[in-house]
Design a protein with these regions (language model features):
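Short amphipathic alpha-helix that is part of the acyltransferase structural core
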Residues: 1-37, 49-53, 78, 144
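Feature marks short, surface-exposed loop/turn motifs that line or immediately flank catalytic pockets
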Residues: 20-21, 68, 119-123
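Catalytic micro-motifs at enzyme active sites that drive phosphoryl/nucleotidyl and oxygen chemistry
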Residues: 39, 66-70, 102
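Short loop/turn motifs at secondary-structure junctions and domain boundaries
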Residues: 40-44
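Conserved beta-strand in the GNAT
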Residues: 51, 57-67, 78
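Conserved acetyl-CoA binding element of GNAT-fold acetyltransferases
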Residues: 72-87, 118
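Acyl-donor-binding surface of acyltransferase catalytic domains
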Residues: 90-144
Length: 144
């Protein structure tokens, strides 16, 4: 089932971030940093955060943001990340999460979605081939 995020999901999202997210290249985070970068970020909204729940377990999530204060935020929504557990990481589940997020953007009057550096939710990732060197604004969707 795809549904909106609730604060009770925060621990599950952090776990997904530090397991599946780090395999995608995102930098590992403790709870305080995760909150600052995502769940308590000023542009975070439960309206634009969706979870994939199966038999009571959160197996994935997608997050995005929008707003008139963001460059072109009056017409587009920004996709921050899509992270799925290894057991749920399928094209179908990715499509379900993205569809929920894009539908929420449409309901808010946005005409298209973007994965770009204009997104104010800047998620740190590890530069490939380095011993943990971070960059602060990763596109949040795998390219393969």
């Amino acid at each position: 089932m795809i549904r909106n995020y609730t604060p009770a999901d925060e621990a599950a999202l952090l776990d997904l971030w530090n397991t599946s997210g780090t395999t995608l290249g995102f930098a590992p985070l403790d709870l305080e940093h995760f909150r600052g970068l995502l769940t308590r970020h000023p542009d975070f909204s439960m309206e634009y955060t969706f979870v994939l729940e199966v038999q009571g377990k959160v197996l994935g999530f997608a997050n995005g943001c929008t707003g008139d204060h963001i460059p072109k935020g009056d017409v587009r929504g920004y996709v921050s990340c899509v992270i799925l557990s290894s057991e749920a990481d399928t094209a179908e589940n990715t499509a379900l999460l993205l569809a929920a997020l894009e539908d929420a953007f449409r309901k808010a009057g946005r005409h298209y979605s973007a994965v770009t550096f204009f997104n104010p939710i800047r998620l740190p990732w590890i530069l490939p081939g380095t011993p943990g060197h971070q960059h602060n604004n990763a596109p949040g969707i795998a390219l393969d």
